[in-house]
Amino acid sequence: MDPEETSVYLDYYYATSPNSDIRETHSHVPYTSVFLPVFYTAVFLTGVLGNLVLMGALHFKPGSRRLIDIFIINLAASDFIFLVTLPLWVDKEASLGLWRTGSFLCKGSSYMISVNMHCSVLLLTCMSVDRYLAIVWPVVSRKFRRTDCAYVVCASIWFISCLLGLPTLLSRELTLIDDKPYCAEKKATPIKLIWSLVALIFTFFVPLLSIVTCYCCIARKLCAHYQQSGKHNKKLKKSIKIIFIVVAAFLVSWLPFNTFKFLAIVSGLRQEHYLPSAILQLGMEVSGPLAFANSCVNPFIYYIFDSYIRRAIVHCLCPCLKNYDFGSSTETSDSHLTKALSTFIHAEDFARRRKRSVSL
């Protein structure tokens, strides 16, 4: 195959330039062949174990399941599926970019990574919307926040993510360059670049805006609630801290990587390249591991900041501690907030009605 008809891309999903040469695009930053195999191996081991424990603890926990747990289990499953492909990329980085595991795994692993990216972002968006409805509109949202609705939403997300990953499955192929195998895509066309740009905007930046908007509204509602109820300081600070940690983890993991991807696609669409391809390549090389690491950090975030999940994991790993008191009630912080805000909203409505009747 002609080398100029293919190109290798560091983001594994989308072609980024219609004129790139595989020899230029494939040039590795020196640290990658040593650091990335070690880093990806650590991500693989901790992520597979963490997500398996998280899924098992929530699935086999006795009693009723929280609505948010359905989204968390699906997110952990998505991360687990992605993590299974990491040994293939460890081998790729260790062999200086050569793909030694065949055409089927070249296509399949790239497709699974693409599905994981879309599925994770959409699930995180739904989780933020669910949290927004539970805290900001606790009374009105009761008819929408049902278990059957959550299962339908998750099934729809998996279906949409599988469809969005099809372009990667169809375009990725094993290519021989100088008798060396590479997992590559055909040269990008302007139509594919436009599709990649639109897909990136609507599957990352729009969900990102939704997530940030939801959590800003939640923070505003919490501030109003605690100011009205007179409960400042510790509870307010803890609630706001958890919110910002969740948002910050998402931003640190995905924003740099997708920003460089966005710039690479835009640069490929323009006749004049304002950013050298070497800078874009370096940016994706450095930020890519952060995006990959997101799949292993979620279980630790939930364990540290969600007492319900922490109890479920400890009881799953150590059944002898089933009756151990963790110093908190069986209800979650969301449950407390939902009940408190429901009372707060009812009180506000009653005050408005009373004020209106007095004015009349």
From Swiss-Prot:
Signal peptide: none annotated. The keyword Plastid does not apply. Residues 1-33, 91-120, 171-192, 261-284 are extracellular. GO terms for molecular function: coreceptor activity; G protein-coupled receptor activity; virus receptor activity. Its main location: membrane. The modification Phosphoserine is found at residue 359. Highly expressed in lymphoid tissues, including macrophages and peripheral blood mononuclear cells. Keywords: Cell membrane, G-protein coupled receptor, Membrane, Phosphoprotein, Receptor, Transducer, Transmembrane, Transmembrane helix. GO terms for biological process: angiogenesis; G protein-coupled receptor signaling pathway; symbiont entry into host cell; T cell migration. PANTHER family: CELL ADHESION MOLECULE, G PROTEIN-COUPLED RECEPTOR 25. G protein-coupled receptor that plays an important role in immune homeostasis. Acts via its natural ligand GPR15LG, a chemokine-like polypeptide strongly expressed in gastrointestinal tissues. GPR15-GPR15LG signaling axis regulates intestinal homeostasis and inflammation through the migration of immune cells. Controls thereby the specific homing of T-cells, particularly FOXP3+ regulatory T-cells (Tregs), to the large intestine lamina propria. Also required for skin localization of thymus-derived dendritic epidermal T-cells. (Microbial infection) Acts as an alternative coreceptor with CD4 for HIV-1 infection. Interacts with adapter YWHAE; this interaction promotes ER-to-Golgi transport of GPR15. Interacts with GNAI1; this interaction initiates the signaling pathway. This is G-protein coupled receptor 15. It comes from Homo sapiens.
